[in-house]
């Protein structure tokens, strides 16, 4: 394991190690990628937890019913693997595949100001949630917001009118009373 990770501002969280698997040092991983197995395409991971940062190399991985199982280079013991529980798995954003126009990674949407069709500022996108039907944006109030309410807005074509990453804004069709 290497202690010299990539620049922290360039790293995007794509998963989390949450437990050990078996007795040979494998770890159980929750993937934030879609599909979940995409996490296994990245061979070098930067692990972060409470100020601790380290780089590891993925040797192999496989899917299971509810999680991924990963084997990391130099990790051959269950007790060593247990120490990695709770670490976030990060990779540099420049390794992400290019998207087509109108497609965005969640990290690109987080922090955007959300403005309705009347020009009212609802707040900023704090994070997104994956639901069965569609993704949901959690919009928290910020300086200049219409009110101090947290809003949950669907990330759908009907709701999202425009995304302007340069301006840091998203225009939405949404009733302020919802």
UniProtKB/Swiss-Prot annotation:
Disulfide bonds: none annotated. Residues 100-178 form the PRC barrel domain. Pfam families: PRC_RimM (PF24986), RimM (PF01782). GO terms for biological process: ribosomal small subunit biogenesis; rRNA processing. InterPro entries: PRC_barrel-like_sf, PRC_RimM, RimM, RimM_N, RimM_N_sf, Transl_B-barrel_sf. Keywords: Chaperone, Cytoplasm, Ribosome biogenesis, rRNA processing. It is found in: Cytoplasm. It comes from the Bacteria. Binds ribosomal protein uS19. An accessory protein needed during the final step in the assembly of 30S ribosomal subunit, possibly for assembly of the head region. Essential for efficient processing of 16S rRNA. May be needed both before and after RbfA during the maturation of 16S rRNA. It has affinity for free ribosomal 30S subunits but not for 70S ribosomes. HAMAP family: Ribosome_mat_RimM. This is Ribosome maturation factor RimM. It comes from Pseudomonas fluorescens (strain SBW25).
């Amino acid at each position: 394991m290497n202690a010299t990770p990539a620049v922290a501002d360039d790293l995007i969280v794509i998963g989390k190690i949450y437990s050990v698997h078996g007795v040979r040092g494998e770890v159980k991983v929750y993937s934030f990628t879609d599909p979940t197995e995409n996490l296994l395409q990245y061979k070098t991971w930067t692990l972060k937890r409470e100020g601790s940062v380290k780089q590891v190399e993925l040797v192999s991985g496989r899917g299971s019913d509810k999680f991924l199982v990963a084997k990391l280079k130099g990790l051959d013991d269950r007790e060593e693997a247990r120490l990695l529980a709770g670490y976030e798995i990060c990779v540099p954003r420049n390794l992400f595949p290019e998207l087509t126009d109108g497609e965005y990674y969640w990290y690109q949407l987080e922090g955007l100001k959300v403005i309705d069709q009347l020009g009212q500022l609802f707040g900023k996108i704090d994070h997104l949630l994956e639901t069965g039907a569609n993704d949901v944006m959690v919009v928290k109030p910020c300086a200049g917001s219409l009110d101090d309410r947290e809003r949950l807005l669907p990330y759908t074509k009907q709701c999202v009118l425009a995304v302007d990453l340069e301006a840091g804004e998203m225009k939405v069709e949404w009733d302020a009373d919802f």
